[in-house]
Amino acid sequence: MAKTCLKVKALRKPKFKVRAYTRCMVCGRPHSVYRKFGLCRICLREKAHRGELPGVTKSSW
């Protein structure tokens, strides 16, 4: 889990645009965050399995 101070820091608008980075809105994970959902791959998978993300289905081919 990310520290609370890091989550708050990520929400603030940075002084320079290049310093901005994405964090998961649920757990605060800084890596592998999907911009469209604002979630990391782990939280995205859990929410998709529970059906909390409308329109997201498991792929099969």
From Swiss-Prot:
Cofactor note: Binds 1 zinc ion per subunit.
Essential cofactor(s): Zn(2+)
GO biological process entries: translation
Signal peptide span: none
Molecular function in Gene Ontology: rRNA binding; structural constituent of ribosome; zinc ion binding
Entry superkingdom: Bacteria
Keywords from the UniProt entry: Metal-binding, Ribonucleoprotein, Ribosomal protein, RNA-binding, rRNA-binding, Zinc
SUPFAM superfamilies recorded: Glucocorticoid receptor-like (DNA-binding domain)
Binding site for Zn(2+): 24, 27, 40, 43
One GO CC annotation: small ribosomal subunit
Keyword RNA-binding: yes
Subunit structure: Part of the 30S ribosomal subunit. Contacts proteins S3 and S10.
Stated family: Belongs to the universal ribosomal protein uS14 family. Zinc-binding uS14 subfamily.
Protein's job: Binds 16S rRNA, required for the assembly of 30S particles and may also be responsible for determining the conformation of the 16S rRNA at the A site.
Protein name: Small ribosomal subunit protein uS14
Organism whose genome encodes this protein: Bifidobacterium animalis subsp. lactis (strain AD011)
Encoding gene per record: rpsZ
